């Protein structure tokens, strides 16, 4: 009785994979929405898709400039790669087409993310070590200073 109210779902056609590791990368919510949409429209065999900023913006309810900002963030994080395309119109003119997005393997982005974290931690440790040495040097100078005569 209960099953007749639910439509049958084809798990191959009605879903798209979103790696769990994406949530550990610290992406902004807008970048996550844009990445999710690109995963939704990608060709699963070539890992590529064509979409304009306007099309993505309409899908995720953002302006094209905001989409451009989040696409830049995704490129910097190493999640996607963009390539400019061009089209030839019927009257023979060459015009800019939409971007070709290539979704890169998530493992590279995760490795880059953790390498950046480790580099930041190393820098902070080095700064702390230098601060302690400077404090010790200043304290030693104060102890060795001659009292005024």
Predicted feature descriptions by range:
Residues 65-134:
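Winged-helix/helix-turn-helix nucleic-acid-interaction surface
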Residues 1-66, 94:
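Short recognition helix of helix-turn-helix/winged-helix DNA-binding domains
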Residues 33, 100-102, 147:
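Generic structural signal for residues positioned in beta-strands
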């Amino acid at each position: 009785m209960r099953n007749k109210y639910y439509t049958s779902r084809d798990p191959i056609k009605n879903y798209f994979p979103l790696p769990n590791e994406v949530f550990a990368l610290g992406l902004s919510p807008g970048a996550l929405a844009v990445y999710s949409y690109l995963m939704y429209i990608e060709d699963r065999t070539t890992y590529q898709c064509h979409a304009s900023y306007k099309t993505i913006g309409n899908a995720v309810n953002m302006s094209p400039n905001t989409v451009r900002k989040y696409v830049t963030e995704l490129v910097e994080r190493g999640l996607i790669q963009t390539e400019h395309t061009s089209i030839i119109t019927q009257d023979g003119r060459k015009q800019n087409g939409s971007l070709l997005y290539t979704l890169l393997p998530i493992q590279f982005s995760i490795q880059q993310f953790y390498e950046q974290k480790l580099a930041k931690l190393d820098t902070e440790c080095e700064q702390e070590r230098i601060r302690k040495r400077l404090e010790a040097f200043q304290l030693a100078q104060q102890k060795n200073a001659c009292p005024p005569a």
